[in-house]
């Protein structure tokens, strides 16, 4: 169940500098850390790795930018990397700053089953605004509710999370 974002987090814990603040490391272990591959070439995470990651070329965003197509991507923190970094072929930087607009809606720091609607309404507010503005030719989003709440194992919370996405999508369709 490998996830590149989790591998980046543990890599930074081992070979990040003193500014690392994701959790209290107590002390930095004196080890030579190497990941299986480099999870983020732009940010050089990790600094040492065993195999070269594949180069992903001609992503959809890259092609859209070549053709001057304006795009908009939005999600909350839990899935922001999926509509940006992973979508762009494991690339942190934008292909064209003038054509790409990325919006991260900060996730709440509470267990997902306690707030299963997450930020669906906030995402939808901004998504509908982007649609109605007419400024974008290509728009993508990721509502994380089904995935993140589903992992809690609470069926009732998951149902609420998915229903909140249903309500949000009804608003998007109206836009």
What are the functions of these language-model segments?
Residues 1-175:
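Feature captures the catalytic ectodomains and active-site-proximal regions of enzymes
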